[in-house]
Amino acid sequence: MNGRQRIHGTGRARIGIGLATALCAISWNASASEHPGQDWYRVNVRMSSQVVAPRGLLRDSQHAATVIFARIHVQLKWRGQNQQASKVVAGSMGEPATHDLAVEIVPHAPSPRNVALATAMPLADSGVRIVVFYDHVEPLLQGHHAPQATVMGYVLAHEIAHVLQGVARHSETGIMRANWTDGDFQLMGTRLLTFTPEDVQLIRRRLAPRDATAGCS
């Protein structure tokens, strides 16, 4: 391994964060700092798999991703392949809506030239929003000291965060780094690889009730 692992490609649904979005995130964060008590937001995730993975791997990776998001007060509720997640419903005043997304694990990447672990479609309105390429992920699971389910959980967390942020961007450090380093995988082993403050802002701002982000588009 060359010390860096590309998380996903750059060819699908790529947009930059405009000045208005950045200013809105700053404004929302300033408001949040005045109210340190954080609300919990719920996200329903329906995951289906076309691969035969080691026993317990997918279940334990879901748990790992759940723990990662719980640290930023986002609750992931996992649904099986045949379980339909509830539809998005508007919360009452001061309560967030429930957000749904779907993850599919497929045996192979669509092209030999595609070296990404997965792809996320943050701008899609419905359907499968995340596709994980198991032939790319499997060697990664066996190449580091971190437990396999933990690494898989971080892959899921990275892609879910893209969808929740609603933009195709990466951070210079942390979970949302475009290319994970050996140091990142060591941090995964101790569950110390985290989202950056900006990543948390973007995720929670989009999950917050609309009245909490009035004026942001």
Each model region followed by its residue ranges:
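Short structural boundary motif marking the start of a folded domain
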Residues: 41-43
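Sec/Tat signal peptide C-region and signal peptidase I cleavage site
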Residues: 28-32
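N-terminal secretory signal peptides that target proteins for export/translocation
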Residues: 1-12
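Solvent-exposed loop and beta-edge segments used for protein-protein assembly and interaction
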Residues: 37-39, 97
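Metzincin-family zinc-dependent endopeptidase catalytic domain
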Residues: 55-163
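Metalloprotease/metallohydrolase-associated module, dominated by Zn2+-dependent proteases
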Residues: 33-37, 46-47, 51-63, 120-146, ...
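Bacterial N-terminal signal peptides
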Residues: 14-27
